[in-house]
Amino acid sequence: MPRVSAEILDISHTGGNESPTLGELLKDFNDSGRKKYPGENAPTQHILDLAPAAETRSVPFLLSFNNLSYNVVLRRRFDFSRRKTASVKTLLDDITGEARDGEILAVLGGSGAGKSTLIDALAGRVAEDSLKGTVTLNGEKVLQSRLLKVISAYVMQDDLLFPMLTVKETLMFASEFRLPRSLPKSKKMERVETLIDQLGLRNAADTVIGDEGHRGVSGGERRRVSIGIDIIHDPILLFLDEPTSGLDSTNAFMVVQVLKRIAQSGSVVIMSIHQPSARIIGLLDRLIILSHGKSVFNGSPVSLPSFFSSFGRPIPEKENITEFALDVIRELEGSSEGTRDLVEFNEKWQQNQTARATTQSRVSLKEAIAASVSRGKLVSGSSGANPISMETVSSYANPPLAETFILAKRYIKNWIRTPELIGMRIGTVMVTGLLLATVYWRLDNTPRGAQERMGFFAFGMSTMFYCCADNIPVFIQERYIFLRETTHNAYRTSSYVISHALVSLPQLLALSIAFAATTFWTVGLSGGLESFFYYCLIIYAAFWSGSSIVTFISGLIPNVMMSYMVTIAYLSYCLLLGGFYINRDRIPLYWIWFHYISLLKYPYEAVLINEFDDPSRCFVKGVQVFDGTLLAEVSHVMKVKLLDTLSGSLGTKITESTCLRTGPDLLMQQGITQLSKWDCLWITLAWGLFFRILFYLSLLFGSKNKRT
């Protein structure tokens, strides 16, 4: 056993933010017995070898859990009665067991038995104050420590991946997120290549993941890629929630074969599984069968026949032992007594079993981890630096700037491989622009032309926001990837939000130029290049704020239909109270507050000011004052006579060429007098920044990945 500093593994909750990762920490040991790889020089990378482990293993890890209980309070929704009744549901009831390195512990049971809940409890995904009982690794409590995130991995049931990245690229990005920055890129690539072979993905290495519209890898390969992402750092503890779900028997068996090799490399593998085949049962080392949160069997699959035989329900020959067991449990659950007798029998049977004989020495956690790293676990880089205490272990492998760059690079690479989506977005905006251009073709400087300009601006600015709603399903899909990756601190939430905002800017700029170029001159807007430049800027700002509000809503409400409903409703209210349908002066006092938080108000007022702020432009001359009134249909001669009559009454000579209303007069009539066009631009940009901050907070506090 290598000598380990006593300071190495203090698993307290303290620590600095910019300190090395665990892989950089655990490097003060004798590494001479480790397998060397071609061209390997210090600093070195420890590469996981998934070949079958030797029979004698000198570094055991023992994950023990005792008397785990977890209850949730069920409150009735929309209960307006005075009686505030709440029922308590038990999800886990006094569960005890253990899992060892080199073995696969499988948790079985029917739907609602508590399989996923037990996996979550062992993986630290249940709030500490809600879970009763203890979980220890080699006798030390690590459930809520930062150490658990460093030495463990959790593979979710969903296989959501970026569809246009290849298998190799997906794993390479995972290595950039999870492996130490000090590790050379060549070593990270070597780790990825090794993992591809170990997962049996060599033939699919350069194949894109794929989705509904793009052919990609098979379901089994996709599941193995998901596992590979989470084991890129070669964790000691590996938790999987139904890794064989949705796979055929062959692919399911191949996945469990991979998990068996991972276990034999020195990992503790714990997974839930619904109904394993006979071949899969042969790969499992220990079973825990649950029924309504209670343990009805805990032991080796080999002992399952004798267990049920002793219970009085012998398993017939050539019968799948777990299928039979689950059928018996399902039958008992439907009886009046339930599984009470089986639970009590299991408790007595456990007490009568002799303790497992083992030649493995019980060692402390710090010694076990240090020796495990020396054998190649926890992929890391070594340098000649002095040993660093566990108190300085960093939660993240990269600084924020590096995380932002990696996230942006991955997003852009996936995005540029979907030219049809890029073209569709730009095409939609251009078609909308061309439609508006033909409807509002070359508007003149008449009262009708002024009114039609306002209609064009109202519809055009609202289009900017509604076009952003297509981002809702895209982000909701990405949200699950974000949750999985941030569960074990692949990157900071702030880095994700910043990169998400930055990569959207070029897209929004292209959309802004496309819309501005197709409408500015065709509609007949004034002001020349300077006015066109500002027109592009305010459209860009409108797209930015629209994209931000949509991103925030989709981060807050992870349901596509509900997000659409909230977004459309909010934008409709913004349009109603933004100043086009009703002037600010006529909005009721109890709704005036919404006028000022309307996202549409500021870009709408900005383009109006940009168009009408020139006092030399006249929009109502002489007889045009009668347009839109009952006198509009009278003869021109009569209108001139009416002007003469008005001149006498007002004491001012009004002729056919007299300007009666300029652009600023129209702005005043619309109640647009409080802000300049540049104020409107900055406020629109600030709204976008505000909603990005809310998006960050919604992810930070709403994506804890823990049961309460």
Curated annotation (Swiss-Prot):
PROSITE patterns: ABC_TRANSPORTER_1, ABC_TRANSPORTER_2. ATP binds at G109, G110, S111, G112, A113, G114, K115, S116. GO terms for molecular function: ABC-type transporter activity; ATP binding; ATP hydrolysis activity. Residues 75-317 form the ABC transporter domain. It is a multi-pass membrane protein. Pfam families: ABC2_membrane, ABC_tran. InterPro entries: AAA+_ATPase, ABC2_TM, ABC_transporter-like_ATP-bd, ABC_transporter-like_CS, ABCG_transporters, P-loop_NTPase. Keywords: ATP-binding, Membrane, Nucleotide-binding, Transmembrane, Transmembrane helix, Transport. GO terms for cellular component: membrane. The chain crosses the membrane at residues 421-441, 456-476, 508-528, 537-557, 560-580, 589-609, 681-701. Residues 402-612 form the ABC transmembrane type-2 domain. It is found in: Membrane. Belongs to the ABC transporter superfamily. ABCG family. Eye pigment precursor importer (TC 3.A.1.204) subfamily. This is ABC transporter G family member 18. It comes from Arabidopsis thaliana.
